[in-house]
Amino acid sequence: MTNSPRTAAIIVAAGRGLRAGAGGPKQYRTLAGRPVIARAMEPFCTHPGVMAVQPVTNPDDTEMFNAAVAGLNFRPAVGGGATRQASVRAGLEALAELKPDIVLIHDAARCFVTPELISRAITAAGATGAALPVVAVTDTIKQVDSSGAVDATPDRASLRIAQTPQAFRFDVILDAHRRAASGGRDDFTDDAAIAEWAGLTVSTFEGDANNMKMTTPEDFAREESRLMAALGDIRTGTGYDVHAFGEGDHVWLCGLKVPHTRGFLAHSDGDVGLHALVDAILGALADGDIGSHFPPTDPQWKGAASDKFLKYAIDRVTARGGRVANLEVTMICERPKIGPLRDAMRQRIAEITGVPVSRVAVKATTSEKLGFTGREEGIAATASATIRLPWGADGLAG
């Protein structure tokens, strides 16, 4: 084995997560505004020691998966099987063409994995060939019989809680999985157990107490509260945009194509509502304005759809570990009338940003026939955005 083994990772995300309650598969639910699976995958996708990340998903979840992990770098997902064991084997077979030295197998529901834990996994597998992260048992454990009566009290000094990523030499764990499948064994709950069954010695290395598996509604409630408490740096920004009317038969407003007697004079699609929101978000980040990120002199933005700009602004918040808490936009115009479109506009902004519609407000007013909007020469919009960033991002104490 070389000092720098060629390492790949499998992210197991084909389960349904029924114990987590309503809301769909748990790996696609959000924590502090970010999908669990994105939190679980990103440390592998960005780790310098991991050359490839292979997701294994349920084919029914393709749309959710693509939306949740947009922007990350990974191999095309493969479909999972009826059991976790079958899903892992599908991931291993998909990686066989790469012939990695080491493979890390990680559950998507463990979304607090750290780069340090990944590095320890790679080192352990390189040294022993098969290893898993563990943490000590701190509670007293009781073994009970079928009636629920205590049958024994094991010595917790020798007990450990298994975690992922579990790490193996690729060739040996692929062989073990193939042998188990051909032997009709499909009841293993983790990959270390398959390695043990195949006669391999499995070593352990230091896990991480925070590397918990999201399983129950209580897990989600607790971790949501913890993460939101850490996002205590609350910031606000405001934005303003205006566009004059020109020739055309429609205008774009808050992501909707609205029939109108005139169009906008604009370099992009001229959506004043979304442009104002972009400026508000960038202002909250102290990150310039829409013109500095998307110069009107740049031909690539000619006729561009403004939802791209808004998604970009949201990504800037996410990249700093934050989330958007509230968005508000006020349209200033005589026509078209905004009232009948208000709910559809709110829904469209929510779709673009991933912000719950209950945190998106669209309002409208006129200038009482005064000024350019009163003369129906164009439309203006103002916006505000409230975001939450982690304490310490700019050297401030929490």
UniProtKB/Swiss-Prot annotation:
InterPro entries found in the cross-reference section: IspD, IspD/F, IspD/TarI, ISPD_synthase_CS, MECDP_synthase, MECDP_synthase_CS, MECDP_synthase_sf, Nucleotide-diphossugar_trans
Gene Ontology molecular function terms on file: 2-C-methyl-D-erythritol 2,4-cyclodiphosphate synthase activity; 2-C-methyl-D-erythritol 4-phosphate cytidylyltransferase activity; metal ion binding
BP terms from Gene Ontology: isopentenyl diphosphate biosynthetic process, methylerythritol 4-phosphate pathway; terpenoid biosynthetic process
Protein family: In the N-terminal section; belongs to the IspD/TarI cytidylyltransferase family. IspD subfamily. In the C-terminal section; belongs to the IspF family.
SUPFAM superfamilies: IpsF-like (SSF69765), Nucleotide-diphospho-sugar transferases (SSF53448)
UniProt keyword annotations, A-Z: Isoprene biosynthesis, Lyase, Metal-binding, Multifunctional enzyme, Nucleotidyltransferase, Transferase
Recorded name of the encoding gene: ispDF
Region (2-C-methyl-D-erythritol 4-phosphate cytidylyltransferase): 1-234
Obligatory cofactor(s): a divalent metal cation
Stored PANTHER family: 2-C-METHYL-D-ERYTHRITOL 2,4-CYCLODIPHOSPHATE SYNTHASE, CHLOROPLASTIC (PTHR43181:SF1)
Pathway connected to this protein: Isoprenoid biosynthesis; isopentenyl diphosphate biosynthesis via DXP pathway; isopentenyl diphosphate from 1-deoxy-D-xylulose 5-phosphate: step 2/6; Isoprenoid biosynthesis; isopentenyl diphosphate biosynthesis via DXP pathway; isopentenyl diphosphate from 1-deoxy-D-xylulose 5-phosphate: step 4/6
EC number, as in UniProt: 2.7.7.60, 4.6.1.12
Site location (Positions MEP for the nucleophilic attack): R156, K213
UniProt protein name: Bifunctional enzyme IspD/IspF
Positions of 4-CDP-2-C-methyl-D-erythritol 2-phosphate binding: D241, V242, H243, H267, S268, D289, I290, G291, T365, T366, S367, E368, F372, R375
Recorded catalytic activity of this chain's protein: 2-C-methyl-D-erythritol 4-phosphate + CTP + H(+) = 4-CDP-2-C-methyl-D-erythritol + diphosphate; 4-CDP-2-C-methyl-D-erythritol 2-phosphate = 2-C-methyl-D-erythritol 2,4-cyclic diphosphate + CMP
Domain of life: Bacteria
Lineage per the UniProt record: Bacteria, Pseudomonadati, Pseudomonadota, Alphaproteobacteria, Hyphomicrobiales
Record's keyword annotation contains Transferase: yes
Keyword Transferase on entry: yes
Region (2-C-methyl-D-erythritol 2,4-cyclodiphosphate synthase): 235-398
UniProt function note: Bifunctional enzyme that catalyzes the formation of 4-diphosphocytidyl-2-C-methyl-D-erythritol from CTP and 2-C-methyl-D-erythritol 4-phosphate (MEP) (IspD), and catalyzes the conversion of 4-diphosphocytidyl-2-C-methyl-D-erythritol 2-phosphate (CDP-ME2P) to 2-C-methyl-D-erythritol 2,4-cyclodiphosphate (ME-CPP) with a corresponding release of cytidine 5-monophosphate (CMP) (IspF).
Residues that coordinate or bind a divalent metal cation: D241, H243, H275
Site (Transition state stabilizer): R19, K26, H267, T366
